[in-house]
A protein has these predicted regions:
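Hydrophobic "anchor" residues
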Residues: 132-133
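A short, polar/charged loop-to-alpha-helix boundary motif
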Residues: 140-155
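Radical SAM enzyme [4Fe-4S]-AdoMet core and its adjacent flexible, acidic
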Residues: 1-124, 128, 137, 141, ...
Length: 167
């Protein structure tokens, strides 16, 4: 997966570096047949996510999305649930019309209002310091507010574990 968090100007703004063009060039030059893009959606980039998905369609093999988590509780990057639901409806329409969004429809629906129960022990996280954390990667780093979570990998695996075959 390669993180692409917006079209050129937005991606560069969020990353605080002029790197978008280099990221896309490296993807296009790669011989790897299955490069995937991952979009972390936030209050800055949400309006252009459908255009970003359209742009990435011919650049990568597939696309996954998740939502930014507000690490400091009052975080200007957190996208409220009304905008989240409206955007997810647009992402679902793109997926249904053939765009390579790899998130399941069940997961995209569940992320709208977070009416799902996380089974976090199913996920292991490799941390930058080399340690491994089992479960939510916020454990030990933050006070966790599951109601504001938007981590789609946790959504997918939790729905599947609980018997949702559409996840």
């Amino acid at each position: 997966w390669v993180s692409v968090d917006g079209l050129a100007q937005t991606h560069n703004q969020l990353r605080n570096a002029e790197i978008f063009d280099r990221v896309i060039e490296n993807i296009q030059r790669s011989a790897h047949p299955k490069i995937l893009a991952h979009i972390t959606i936030n209050a800055v980039n949400f309006a252009e996510v459908p255009d970003l998905i359209r742009y990435l369609r011919g650049v990568v093999k597939g696309i996954t999305v998740q939502f930014y988590y507000p690490y400091h509780r009052q975080d200007e990057l957190f996208l409220d649930f009304q905008h989240r639901a409206e955007l997810l409806d647009r992402v679902i329409r793109l997926k249904k019309s053939g765009y390579p969004v790899m998130n399941s429809l069940a997961s995209l629906e569940a992320l709208k209002e977070n009416h799902w129960t996380c089974v976090d022990w199913l996920v292991d996280c490799a941390n930058p310091d080399g340690s491994i954390t089992q479960g939510c990667y916020l454990k030990g780093h933050e006070d966790i507010d599951c109601a504001r979570c938007g981590f789609s990998p946790h959504t997918e695996i939790s729905l599947a574990y609980r018997g949702n075959l559409a996840a």
